[in-house]
């Protein structure tokens, strides 16, 4: 085999490979001989079909098979001999493959860059932490109890106030004429609640059971009924009953009714949930800070093929958000050229950071265990109650789909490794500060 390097430009490499025709001829004859041992043909005993007849019947197919195998073997050998690390699958193009002549083909590829791992011990990070207070546990339990509140009719003669529930009949009109979908009977309206036209519920505050009132509202510009969007309308309101929510008393009996031995166990459950939530937010913040530090030091070139693939995936998501009208305000104000440039820079950063994280893991023998994979699968199944069996069967039938789980696991294990070496200082912050920007 003869290999000539034709391109060395940045991370791009090009080669011309020539495999002697004699090698191909030898492989073809060997393959034909193998076929002759099993080939059956009328008039001949099994394995006794003349090689000339085997060649006539299978010659072209064997030639194609041998050529493909030779290209693959020669490419792999060439890459291994030169210790190349392709970024993506090499591009191979056959130049010459005539019978009884040498096989000539070209190989073009991008190699992974030389990645220098920064001194992880020199990295300093701050890890925000927000201790759970007794008052916050009280608030969490109170919200839980409020969700299980029952309603009761208000018997005293008083006007409706924020937090009350007013049972009403209403009739909407435009220019004095009732419009479709604008009427309701015995409808419970929570004063101060959401989900109504702005100003609708608010104008019912102060009404008493038995009273009537005409209110005026303006429908939102983005209202689902186009004929009403941005239009003014009136509603005839008849208040029929005033109700209020009565939250259950938070005591041992309430705790027992919800599956706990006593109030102390109930409080511990909520304390643990709050702690877990904050531990997750704290972990996310310090992980982001670490990855930002690593990204700053990932100053090696990024393979264009990987950047192109990453950008294509990002841009598909951007286009989907744009079509759904969910593009954020900042991006919506940019022209496409600027938007593409911004997201290509993000794609390049992701590729560089991914290569650095991969190199840290490879160099330090970070491994994904079967236990890691089981935990990840259990976590995924917990997100879809009742579909556990279907998810398990999916992964059993599609082993390559497990790569989607391996990536995040590997990244987290590398982060754990790096955090053990870095200097991490805990800083107490408020819960609001801890959770700020954690949903980006």
Curated annotation (Swiss-Prot):
Q: What EC number(s) would the UniProt record show?
A: 5.2.1.8
Q: Which residues form the PPIase FKBP-type domain?
A: 163-248
Its GO biological process annotations read: 'de novo' cotranslational protein folding; cell division; chaperone-mediated protein folding; protein transport; protein unfolding
Cellular component (GO) terms are:
cytoplasm
Its localization reads:
Cytoplasm
Classify the source by domain of life. Bacteria
Molecular function via GO: peptidyl-prolyl cis-trans isomerase activity; protein folding chaperone; ribosome binding
Q: Does the keyword Cell cycle apply?
A: yes
Q: Report keywords, A-Z.
A: Cell cycle, Cell division, Chaperone, Cytoplasm, Isomerase, Rotamase
Q: Which reaction does it catalyse?
A: [protein]-peptidylproline (omega=180) = [protein]-peptidylproline (omega=0)
Alphabetized SUPFAM superfamilies for the sequence: FKBP-like, Triger factor/SurA peptide-binding domain-like, Trigger factor ribosome-binding domain
Instruction: Look at the named UniProt entry and state the broad enzyme category this protein falls under.
Output: isomerase
User: Any idea what job this protein has?
Assistant: Involved in protein export. Acts as a chaperone by maintaining the newly synthesized protein in an open conformation. Functions as a peptidyl-prolyl cis-trans isomerase.
Task: Name the protein family.
Answer: Belongs to the FKBP-type PPIase family. Tig subfamily.
What does UniProt say about this protein's domains? Consists of 3 domains; the N-terminus binds the ribosome, the middle domain has PPIase activity, while the C-terminus has intrinsic chaperone activity on its own.
- Protein known as: Trigger factor
């Amino acid at each position: 085999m003869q290999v000539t390097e034709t391109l060395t430009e940045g991370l791009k490499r090009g080669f011309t490979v020539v495999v002697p025709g004699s090698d191909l001829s030898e492989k073809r004859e060997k393959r034909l001989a193998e076929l002759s041992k099993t080939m059956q043909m009328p008039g001949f005993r099994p394995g006794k079909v003349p090689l000339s007849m085997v060649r006539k019947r299978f010659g072209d197919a064997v030639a194609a098979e041998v050529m493909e195998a030779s290209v693959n073997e020669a490419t792999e050998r060439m890459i291994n001999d030169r210790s190349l690390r392709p970024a993506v699958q090499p591009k191979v193009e056959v130049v010459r493959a005539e019978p009884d002549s040498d096989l000539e083909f070209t190989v073009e590829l991008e190699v992974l860059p030389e990645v220098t791992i920064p001194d992880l011990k020199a990295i300093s990070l701050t890890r925000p932490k927000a201790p759970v207070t007794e008052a916050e546990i009280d608030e969490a339990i109170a919200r839980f109890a409020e969700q299980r509140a029952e309603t009761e009719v208000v018997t005293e003669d008083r006007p409706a106030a924020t937090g009350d529930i007013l049972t009403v009949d209403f009739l909407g009109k435009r220019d004095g004429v009732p419009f479709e979908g604008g009427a309701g009977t015995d409808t419970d309206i929570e004063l101060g609640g959401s989900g109504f036209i702005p100003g609708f519920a608010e104008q019912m505050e102060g009404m008493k059971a038995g009273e009537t009132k005409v209110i005026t509202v303006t429908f939102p510009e983005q209202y689902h009924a186009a004929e009403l969007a941005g239009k003014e309308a009136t509603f005839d309101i008849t208040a029929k009953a005033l109700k209020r929510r009565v939250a259950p008393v938070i005591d041992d009996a309430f705790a027992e009714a919800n599956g706990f031995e006593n109030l102390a166990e109930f409080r511990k459950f909520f304390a643990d949930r709050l702690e877990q939530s904050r531990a997750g937010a704290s972990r996310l913040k310090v992980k982001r800070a670490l990855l930002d530090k690593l990204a700053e030091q990932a100053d090696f070139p990024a393979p264009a093929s990987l950047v192109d693939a990453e950008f294509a995936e990002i841009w598909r998501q951007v286009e989907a958000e744009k079509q759904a009208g969910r593009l954020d305000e900042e991006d919506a104000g940019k022209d496409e050229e600027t938007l593409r440039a911004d997201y290509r820079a993000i794609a390049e950063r992701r590729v560089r950071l991914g290569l650095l994280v991969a190199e840290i893991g490879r160099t330090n023998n970070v491994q994904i265990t079967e236990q890691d994979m089981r935990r990840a699968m259990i976590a995924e199944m917990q997100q879809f109650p009742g579909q556990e069996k279907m998810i398990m069967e999916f992964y059993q039938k599609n082993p390559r789909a497990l790569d989607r789980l391996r990536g995040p696991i590997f990244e987290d294990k590398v982060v754990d490794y790096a955090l053990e070496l870095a200097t991490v200082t805990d800083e107490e912050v408020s819960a609001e500060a801890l959770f700020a920007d954690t949903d980006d």
